[in-house]
From Swiss-Prot:
Belongs to the bacterial ribosomal protein bL36 family. The keyword Ribonucleoprotein applies. PANTHER family: 50S RIBOSOMAL PROTEIN L36, CHLOROPLASTIC, LARGE RIBOSOMAL SUBUNIT PROTEIN BL36C. The lineage of its organism: Bacteria, Pseudomonadati, Pseudomonadota, Gammaproteobacteria, Cellvibrionales. Pfam families: Ribosomal_L36. Keywords: Ribonucleoprotein, Ribosomal protein. One of its GO terms (biological process) is translation. GO terms for cellular component: cytoplasm; ribonucleoprotein complex; ribosome. GO terms for molecular function: structural constituent of ribosome. It comes from Cellvibrio japonicus (strain Ueda107) (Pseudomonas fluorescens subsp. cellulosa). This is Large ribosomal subunit protein bL36. It comes from the Bacteria.
Amino acid sequence: MKVRASVKKICRNCKMVRRNGVLRVICSVEPRHKQRQG
């Protein structure tokens, strides 16, 4: 899980999700692409 000020989709399988007011990127194909805005 990377914590970044600016989260971006890294590959075409990445999805932007807002959970509890926090923007996250989840990726089912490459778990290393997980990010959270912080």
